[in-house]
């Protein structure tokens, strides 16, 4: 997987003398030397009956034999937008501009659907569908006559699903973000999608708004087509797709309704044809250097705790060794530069107008924190793309010297509760710090009495039960919500305190869980715990009333239970058949539970990571007749 820079080649020159046929003595090659895969389907004189069979059904909606046998590259548009996926629905419009770009550059566009993933409507969790969409897209990219692909990304899980599949197959690929929604407003204040939900829950629990007011407040943030306008998982992953090099520079932050979004869709369509000519593949772009850059960018933008899961999954599928511990190694000491909710004040439109990802990268470059030679989708290095980028609004994007917070990266914790878990330090509020982290003798550590909930249903049923005697220093623990237990790892770790504490002005308690939380949440939870309770991890042994000690400086989280008692609990759990969780409801739930890895390893399907660069290592798929 070379990271050497490739010189961009005009598509019309590179593709000028190709297309005779894909097998035999005269192979279909362009000036760069690679074979266009699609010729094996559409122009194979050595097997004319199969050529005819492959051709004829693509003619029935208006494509011509001349086009399909012209030697022009066939470019897929992996369409993630649909009525079921409102965050990505605008891609149905953008795809027309992508088509025009592909045709302008000398390619032929073929659009196809990707399994829908909508964060806010899929039960039991959209994370269950990331690997399913990945599998389907791998089969399409490998098994159909495609020479390159435009990946339409946006809502949380669509981005990693698409990049994972592109990494596995390893044909030329470029990503196009759908873009964030326009800014939300409620009574003169910015309301960020997702983030406002957690604030509205507090107000509802405190009795300050009724149910109608709750819905009105939440809906105020959903202003237009596009994904969450906060620095949630969607904006995070789209920004990181750019820092990885898989999007055109400056494209991630463009709001969905802006004219620039349609323009970049056209440019993306043009560029993928050139990438096919240059044979510029995901493995050339997504190198270890690109992943190190991405970890640092994630810290600087205040990115979601879902990022380590998804980025590590992408790395595993492209064959790059990346551990959860490296998120602390490379990212912990990076300052917070982007002032977006939930860690800050502003929203997506402001992020774009302030300079987006290039402005952030430029600040990190000045400190020598970016691997500048990492190649990107436009054929240039990230250094070339971002060196002259400027901050256009210093209220939204800060300089490295005057950040919002000096350290914004994740702390990776371990102990007898789990082998690894992640805490997002950029969202630790002053109120939380004063209550949990203000002991001058031990300023980065806290202890608390554990209150255990087995799943969100148990939590919602009992959180306001006075018999639990939850106070301002308790630690809420939720388990059974991981990749196996839920299944899919639910976004439920950011638990609100009991209503009586909210009325006292306590808006957040320390939370620990083997699930995830929305990237739009401002809760400084300890989450992504691996192994999960359903894999008989340490959280399965915990009991309500146990005391937990968390030390951020040492990176530890432990139940203060004797080793002999802990071992006895482990033996008792094994004797009882292990931690119990709900049964399978669908065939896919059973399949995924049997194959899925833990969150620290990217929550990938374990057998799938053995399949890498399959377009080149596995040969052509066999004929179908």
Residues covered by each model-derived region:
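Catalytic or ion-coupling anion/metal-binding cores of large enzyme and transporter domains
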Residues: 2-87, 96-114, 120, 126, ...
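Glycine-rich beta-alpha loop segments
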Residues: 91
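N-terminal small/polar loop signature for handling phosphorylated ligands or for N-terminal nucleophile
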Residues: 111-144
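A short, small-residue-rich loop immediately preceding and capping a beta-strand
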Residues: 141-162, 173-178
């Amino acid at each position: 997987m070379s990271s050497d820079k490739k010189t961009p080649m005009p598509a019309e020159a590179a593709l000028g003398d190709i297309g005779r046929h894909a097998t035999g003595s005269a192979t279909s090659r362009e000036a760069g030397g690679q074979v266009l895969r699609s010729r094996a389907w559409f122009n194979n004189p050595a097997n004319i009956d199969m050529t005819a069979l492959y051709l004829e059904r693509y003619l029935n909606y208006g494509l011509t034999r001349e086009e399909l046998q012209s030697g022009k590259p066939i470019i897929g548009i992996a369409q993630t937008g649909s009525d079921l996926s409102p965050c990505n629905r605008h891609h149905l419009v953008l795809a027309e501009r992508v088509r025009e770009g592909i045709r302008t550059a000398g390619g032929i566009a073929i659009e196809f659907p990707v399994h829908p993933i909508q964060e806010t409507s899929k039960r039991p969790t959209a994370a269950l569908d990331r690997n399913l969409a990945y599998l389907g897209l791998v089969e399409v990219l490998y098994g159909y006559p495609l020479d390159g692909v435009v990946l339409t990304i946006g809502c949380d899980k669509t981005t990693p699903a698409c990049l994972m599949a592109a990494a596995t197959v390893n044909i030329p690929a470029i990503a196009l973000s759908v873009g964030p929604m326009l800014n939300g407003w409620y009574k003169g204040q910015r309301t960020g999608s997702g983030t406002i939900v957690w604030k509205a829950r507090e107000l509802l629990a405190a009795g300050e708004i009724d149910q109608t007011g709750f819905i009105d407040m939440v809906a105020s943030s959903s202003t237009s087509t596009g994904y969450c306008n906060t620095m949630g998982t969607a904006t995070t992953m789209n920004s990181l797709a750019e820092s990885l090099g898989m999007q055109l520079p400056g494209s991630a932050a463009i709001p969905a309704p802006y004219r620039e979004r349609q323009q970049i869709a056209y440019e993306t369509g043009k560029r993928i044809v050139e990438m096919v000519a240059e044979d510029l593949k995901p493995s050339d772009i997504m190198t270890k250097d690109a992943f190190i850059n991405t970890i640092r960018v994630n810290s600087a933008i205040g990115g979601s705790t879902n990022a380590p899961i998804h980025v590590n999954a992408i790395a595993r599928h492209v064959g790059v060794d990346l551990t959860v511990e490296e998120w602390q190694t490379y990212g912990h000491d990076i300052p917070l530069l982007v002032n977006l909710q939930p860690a800050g004040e502003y929203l997506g439109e402001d992020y774009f107008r302030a300079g987006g990802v290039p402005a952030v990268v430029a600040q990190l470059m000045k400190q020598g924190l970016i691997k500048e030679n990492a190649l990107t989708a436009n054929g240039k290095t990230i250094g070339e793309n971002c060196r002259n980028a400027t901050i256009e609004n210093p209220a939204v994007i800060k300089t490295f010297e005057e950040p919002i917070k000096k350290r914004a990266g994740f702390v990776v914790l371990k102990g007898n509760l789990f082998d690894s878990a992640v805490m997002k330090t950029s969202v630790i509020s002053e109120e939380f710090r004063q209550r949990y982290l203000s002991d001058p003798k031990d300023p980065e550590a806290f202890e608390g009495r554990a209150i255990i909930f087995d799943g969100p249903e148990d939590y919602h049923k009992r959180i306001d039960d006075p018999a639990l005697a939850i106070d301002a220093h308790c630690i809420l623990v939720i388990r059974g919500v991981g990749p196996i237990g839920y299944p899919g790892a639910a976004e439920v770790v950011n638990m609100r305190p009991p209503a009586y504490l909210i009325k006292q002005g306590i808006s957040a308690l320390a939370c620990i869980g083997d699930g995830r939380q929305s990237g739009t949440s401002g809760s400084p939870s300890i989450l992504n715990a691996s192994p999960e309770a359903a894999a008989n991890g340490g959280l399965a042994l915990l009991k309500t009333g146990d005391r937990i000690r968390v030390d951020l400086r040492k990176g530890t989280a432990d139940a203060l239970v004797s080793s002999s008692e802990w071992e006895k609990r482990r033996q008792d759990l094994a004797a009882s058949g292990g931690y119990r969780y709900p049964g399978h409801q669908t065939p896919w739930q059973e399949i995924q539970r049997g194959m899925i890895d833990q969150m620290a390893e990217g929550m990938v399907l374990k057998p799938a990571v053995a399949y890498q660069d399959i377009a080149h290592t596995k040969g052509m798929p066999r004929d179908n007749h």
